Amino acid sequence: ALAEPAAVALHAVLLAEQNLKKPLSESKILIQGAGAIGLLCGLVLNKEKNSTNIIMSDPNKKRLDECAKYLKADFVSPDNKSIKENNFDLILESVGLEVTRHQAIKSIAPGGTILHIGLTQPSGSFDFKKLTIQEVTLVGTYCYTNKDFEQTLKILNEKKLGDLGWIEYRDLKKGSEAFNEIHNGTCVAPKIILIP
């Protein structure tokens, strides 16, 4: 239940590394979304790539507080003033809403890279003028390769992502309640695993 989102996160970070014009450890990074994939992207950046110049944004303050226990980053609401225009070398958009895509393109620095991971809203408008004029790289990322998955299993087996106390386990009978909390934005845990 954790290997799949961790492999998605690792794959996204590896694609970012391939497309950035400077090392990840020297890049100013914004992670949009504090769910499992956003947090796992941050953990891969922290633990595997020595990146700590990270801001994570999410409207769910309680979830950000939970992520702050495990991730070296600054944690802010999406409307926080620290998310400035033309400010980030790398943005990992793990939400997939039109509003987060707009914020990503607005906040990316000239020559920066946006990794689009989230799939909540499959369509919407996008500022292609800025993308073109400022030579922003936009990379769509979906799933992972077999090699990424094998590397993820090794990372998880060796406990390289640290304490996984941010995962919440619930009885399968409470699945509907969990999905409602996720949908309503009140779920604290970045990842819930339902146990039959």
Describe the predicted segments one by one:
Residues 1-78:
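Mid-domain Rossmann-like dinucleotide-binding core that forms the NAD(H)/NADP(H) cofactor-binding site
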Residues 23, 95, 107-109:
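A generic alpha-to-beta junction signature in SAM-dependent methyltransferases
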Residues 25-28, 88, 111:
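Phosphate-coordination loops involved in phosphoryl transfer and adenosine-cofactor binding
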Residues 31, 93, 116:
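Redox-cofactor binding/interface segments in oxidoreductases and associated redox assembly factors
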Residues 73-80, 169-174:
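Short acidic-hydrophobic, aromatic-tinged amphipathic segments that line or gate anion-handling sites
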Residues 82-91:
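A short acidic, Gly/Pro-enriched loop at the edge of an enzyme's catalytic core
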Residues 99-158, 195-196:
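Glycine-rich phosphate-binding loop and adjacent beta-alpha segment
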Residues 102, 146, 150-196:
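C-terminal hydrophobic helical "lid"/dimerization subdomain
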